[in-house]
């Protein structure tokens, strides 16, 4: 082999030649379908090129970390009123909707499992003085207020804390925005006469039957609003990842 000490032009990997032939033989016999994990249009396109037959997990929180979105996310988290929180969510809606439009277009009728916001909110908050300063200029809060709020939201054991569907119950407007983005993206794809994608909405970290009922009712409520606003019918699945002890 060779040791290269500098950057060199690279080639995009592709399935070709003998490997492509071998995989085509496997395709003619296999019974399983393979989906991908993807949260961006670019990753989704790459996965389709490699033969993915749907998205098994689209983690929506990863869409929030882009530079043009993270400030609005932090503004939403630090909002003291529902009105202020909704203003911040209104800034995020177009971004998330556009992501879903592109993902649904690329998947072209294949199933897409979308997991609603899962991590605890402190994971989105600023980690250094520059980020705190940027957030201060947007929210009007001083650095000490932001640091104090960050400490309040910090979860010592996030797996058992305020995350997943428990966030959706405490702040339903967050999940309402995400569901609206999904359904409005479906409507846009329908207007473009694209193949209909069946989104599978995953409610994260459900512990009880009551939690899934609350979240299911929220999803259905948003669906009806978007259907009425656009005079159309929307098809989807809603559920959760369950662990069964045998």
Regions found by a protein language model. Name each.
Residues 1:
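Conformationally flexible catalytic loops at phosphate/diphosphate-handling active centers
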Residues 5:
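Phosphate/pyrophosphate-binding betaalpha-module
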Residues 12-16:
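C-terminal, low-ordered peptide segments at domain boundaries
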Residues 18-244:
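Conserved alpha/beta-domain cores
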């Amino acid at each position: 082999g060779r040791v290269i000490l500098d950057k060199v032009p690279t080639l995009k990997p592709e399935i070709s030649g003998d490997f492509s032939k071998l995989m085509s033989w496997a395709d003619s016999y296999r019974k399983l379908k393979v989906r991908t994990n993807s949260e961006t249009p670019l990753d989704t396109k790459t996965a389709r090129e490699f033969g993915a037959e749907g998205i098994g997990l689209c983690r929506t929180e990863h869409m929030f970390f882009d530079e043009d979105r993270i400030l609005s996310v932090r503004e939403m988290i630090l909002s003291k009123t529902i009105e202020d929180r909704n203003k911040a969510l209104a800034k995020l809606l177009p971004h998330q909707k556009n992501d879903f439009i592109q993902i649904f277009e690329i998947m072209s009728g294949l199933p897409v499992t979308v997991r609603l916001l899962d991590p605890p909110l402190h994971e989105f908050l600023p980690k250094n003085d520059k980020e705190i300063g940027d957030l201060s200029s947007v929210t009007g809060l001083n650095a000490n207020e932001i640091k104090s709020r960050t400490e309040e939201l910090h979860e010592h054991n996030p797996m058992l804390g305020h995350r997943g569907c428990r966030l959706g119950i405490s702040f339903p407007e967050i999940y309402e925005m995400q569901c609206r983005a999904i359904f409005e993206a479906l409507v846009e794809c329908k207007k473009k006469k694209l193949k209909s994608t069946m989104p599978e909405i995953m409610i994260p970290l459900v512990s009880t039957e009551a939690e899934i009922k609350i979240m299911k009712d929220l999803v259905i409520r948003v669906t009806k609003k978007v259907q009425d606003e656009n005079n159309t019918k929307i098809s989807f699945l809603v559920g959760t990842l369950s662990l069964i002890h045998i």
